[in-house]
């Protein structure tokens, strides 16, 4: 009986795939674009992105086509992350997830009800290919925490970059459990790959991203949550009938922070946050840098720490400003002039009632400066001490 049910479920899944393919084929996708252009026309999907060059934010934005990013977990944060990277024109996107789309996922962004039952990576790939056919999308539908699949995951992020045989440029962790985070952490420490860890709290009102550079900053095992440190099984913490809360707003904000910092890292602009948190209750955004733990349990992390400490530190060269005869500003576009401290200040004359519009009268008129000075001089000259007055009275 159970075997027959499994067969029926497999048939239903195949029919859903065929139906999805039929719907996709009816939609007309745009043709591929060989080269990014800054031309401002309605038919150019990259004109707004290339405008970052004209505004001196990014140099050579089209370099993004040479980058490969792996997104692990295509859920509330991961699906939006993949969507943003696709719209930004990333060169290659590698998706990892083994879950299926459910109607319970509809409170999040990206997925649609007609995709229920499809694998998340498959549903995401079809939508993303339609959004931007220029992006090369690769999908992997398996659990990376098993022994065999971990080796497959390790090989993929090491050899499936934009150029085959090269590692990916960045790994983005968008998973919702500590076991998967530890697997990503172990893989990136072993292969010395930079990666971002992200997450949203179970009450859905806070999130964070963390940029991990092996050896330079703390890895996920350097300062693990209590659940990981105590080797507690996460499944035992979940009560029956109780699930984590989820808000598309918090998911979208966290994904936005994640992709924003990923772009800054990939295209070398701005400052990449080592850790950025978000608390929705009071709109609090803490930033910090976590240093690696010299007693970390991950041996590869300890190895990366030694390698980082052995690197020669960059020498800071201070420029000798005094030796330059050229002015600091060759041109003075705004006509700014420096005024000496001892130069008299020209104060504007106070307004008079006669100078205002007819029918209006000033509530207070400042006295003329000459009269004020004369009154002050007269007051000073009339002042006599008490001793002098008593001496004058005695002499009378």
From Swiss-Prot:
The source's domain of life comes to Eukaryota
Report the record's Gene Ontology biological process terms: protein ufmylation
Give the binding site residues for ATP.
Answer: 76, 97, 120, 143, 177
What is known about what this protein does? E1-like enzyme which activates UFM1.
The UniProt record lists the keyword ATP-binding: yes
Please indicate if the UniProt record lists Protein biosynthesis as a keyword: no
Active-site residue numbers: 243 (glycyl thioester intermediate)
The Swiss-Prot or TrEMBL record describes its family as follows: Belongs to the ubiquitin-activating E1 family. UBA5 subfamily.
- Binding residues annotated for Zn(2+), in chain numbering: 219, 222, 296, 301
* A cellular-component GO term for this protein: cytosol
- Provide the alphabetized UniProt keywords: ATP-binding, Metal-binding, Nucleotide-binding, Ubl conjugation pathway, Zinc
**What is the protein name given in its UniProt record?**
Ubiquitin-like modifier-activating enzyme 5
The protein's GO terms of the molecular function aspect are: ATP binding; metal ion binding; UFM1 activating enzyme activity
């Amino acid at each position: 009986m159970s075997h027959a049910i499994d067969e029926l479920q497999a048939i239903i899944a195949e029919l859903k795939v065929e139906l999805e393919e039929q719907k996709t084929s009816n939609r007309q996708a745009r043709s591929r674009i060989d080269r990014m252009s800054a031309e401002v026309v309605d038919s150019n999907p990259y004109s707004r992105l290339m405008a970052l060059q004209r505004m001196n934010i990014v140099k050579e934005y089209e370099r993004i086509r040479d980058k490969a990013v792996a997104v692990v977990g295509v859920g509330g944060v991961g699906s939006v992350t993949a969507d943003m990277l696709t719209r930004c024109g990333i060169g290659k996107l590698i998706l990892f997830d083994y879950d299926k789309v459910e109607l319970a996922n509809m409170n999040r962004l990206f997925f649609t009800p007609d995709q229920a039952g499809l694998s998340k990576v498959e549903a995401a790939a079809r939508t993303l290919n339609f959004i931007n056919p220029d992006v090369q999308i690769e999908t992997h539908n398996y659990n990376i925490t098993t022994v065999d699949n971990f080796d497959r995951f390790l090989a993929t992020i090491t050899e499936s970059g934009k150029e085959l045989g090269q590692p990916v440029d960045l790994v983005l962790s968008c998973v919702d459990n500590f076991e998967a985070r530890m697997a990503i952490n172990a893989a990136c420490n072993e292969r010395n790959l930079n990666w971002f860890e992200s997450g949203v709290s179970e009450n859905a009102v806070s999130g964070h991203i963390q940029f991990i550079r092996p050896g330079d900053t703390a890895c996920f095992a350097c300062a693990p949550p209590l659940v990981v440190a105590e080797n507690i099984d996460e499944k035992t913490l979940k009560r029956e009938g109780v699930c984590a809360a989820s808000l598309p707003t918090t998911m979208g904000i966290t994904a936005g922070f994640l992709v924003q910092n990923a772009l800054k890292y990939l295209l070398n602009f701005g400052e990449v946050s080592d850790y950025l948190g978000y608390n929705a209750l009071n709109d609090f955004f803490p930033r910090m840098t976590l240093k690696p733990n010299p007693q970390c349990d991950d041996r590869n992390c300890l190895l990366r720490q030694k390698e980082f400490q052995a690197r020669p530190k960059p020498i800071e060269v201070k420029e000798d400003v005094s030796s330059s005869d050229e002015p600091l500003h060759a041109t003075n576009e705004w006509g700014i002039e420096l005024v000496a401290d001892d130069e008299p200040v020209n104060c504007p004359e106070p307004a008079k009632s006669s100078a205002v519009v007819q029918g209006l009268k000033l509530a207070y008129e400042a006295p003329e400066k000459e009269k004020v000075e004369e009154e002050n001089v007269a007051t000073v000259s009339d002042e006599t001490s008490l001793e002098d007055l008593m001496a004058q009275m005695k002499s009378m």
